[in-house]
Amino acid sequence: MAAAFASRLTRGGRSLLGGLNNGGSMNSSNGMMNESILSQQQQRRTFIQMGTVLKVVDNSGAKKVMCIQALKGKKGARLGDTIVASVKEAMPNGKVKKGAVVYGVVVRAAMQRGRVDGSEVRFDDNAVVLVDSKDKNTKTDRQPIGTRVFGPVPHELRKKKHLKILALAQHVA
């Protein structure tokens, strides 16, 4: 794959990836590092989609979750969207266990999002707050599983009706 990608980005026999030639062989030891940095930068600025690992920023007991699906039929999730996730790391005495399928609200995303005043909000990591599954009989929104939310959360959650998360948050950005 790297050879096909590099062959499209060559200019006069010199690769823009810094060391990969048209044959796919390495010219320098720095070429593979440049390719991995390029792929990391591209991954960090995309939607939260299937396979994305997110940090859990509440005290529900989970540490890391992996996104299974973004709800509402979207191709990916952004700030304030609800996702279905699988718990990958958990505390031994937490409310949720490893391997459990949970719902979560995205409270921090590395992909930038424009605000009405022209500014843009972007966070350093992708983070989620776990919420309970909504019953069909109740008409209330999903409530957080934990009782504390760590770190900043954007005020755009107010538009998405996640007021309980805003009330539990330490800092609203």
Curated annotation (Swiss-Prot):
Molecular functions (GO terms):
rRNA binding; structural constituent of ribosome
Q: Where in the cell is it found?
A: Mitochondrion
Which keywords does this Swiss-Prot/TrEMBL entry list? Mitochondrion, Ribonucleoprotein, Ribosomal protein, RNA-binding, rRNA-binding, Transit peptide
Q: Where are the transmembrane segments?
A: none
The answer, when asked if GTP-binding is one of the entry's keywords, is no
Expressed, tissue-wise, as follows: Mostly expressed in leaves and inflorescences, including floral organs and meristems, and, to a lower extent, in pistils.
Principal localization reads mitochondrion
Gene Ontology cellular component list? large ribosomal subunit; mitochondrion
- Give the multimer and partner information: Part of the mitochondrial 50S ribosomal subunit.
PANTHER family on file: 50S/60S RIBOSOMAL PROTEIN L14/L23, LARGE RIBOSOMAL SUBUNIT PROTEIN UL14M
Q: What is the name attached to this protein's record?
A: Large ribosomal subunit protein uL14mz
Gene giving rise to this polypeptide? HLP
